[in-house]
């Protein structure tokens, strides 16, 4: 009889161990899912904050610099054209400035 009780105890403990193992695995799975959800929420919030800050700052600074460069580029050829037009409009003045008679 003692052998049967030992075998029964071993069987129960094996079943108990199996059930406990399943419960532990279920709990671990739940914890992992919760962690993933929390991490996704945290990462999503952090990314949105970073994107908002970076986009706002970079766009403002970048636009101002681009506008200044465009204005300088636009002024350059216009000034050259204006000087050429003055030379063509006043040929007499050009000659007198060069030392030739008018």
UniProtKB/Swiss-Prot annotation:
Region of interest (Disordered), ranges: 1-102
InterPro entries (alphabetical): Pro/parathymosin
Annotated Acidic residues bias: 38-76
One GO-annotated biological process of the protein: negative regulation of apoptotic process
Acetylation recorded as keyword: yes
Taxonomy, superkingdom: Eukaryota
UniProt keyword list: Acetylation, Immunity, Phosphoprotein
Modified residues (Phosphoserine): 2, 5, 13
Sample GO molecular function, one term: histone binding
Post-translational modification N6-acetyllysine, affected residues: 4, 15, 92
Modified residues (Phosphothreonine): 52
Modified residues (N-acetylserine): 2
GO cellular component labels: nucleus
Composition bias, Basic and acidic residues: 13-37
Family listed: Belongs to the pro/parathymosin family.
Function: Parathymosin may mediate immune function by blocking the effect of prothymosin alpha which confers resistance to certain opportunistic infections.
Protein name, entry field: Parathymosin
């Amino acid at each position: 009889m003692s052998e049967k009780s030992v075998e029964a105890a071993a069987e129960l403990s094996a079943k108990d161990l199996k059930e406990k193992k399943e419960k532990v695995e279920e709990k671990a799975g739940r914890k992992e899912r919760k962690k993933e959800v929390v991490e996704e929420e945290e990462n999503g919030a952090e990314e949105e904050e970073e994107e908002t800050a970076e986009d706002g700052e970079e766009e403002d600074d970048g636009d101002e610099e681009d506008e200044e460069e465009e204005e300088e580029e636009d002024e350059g050829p216009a000034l050259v054209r204006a000087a050429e037009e003055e030379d063509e409009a006043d040929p007499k003045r050009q000659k007198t400035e060069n030392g030739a008679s008018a």
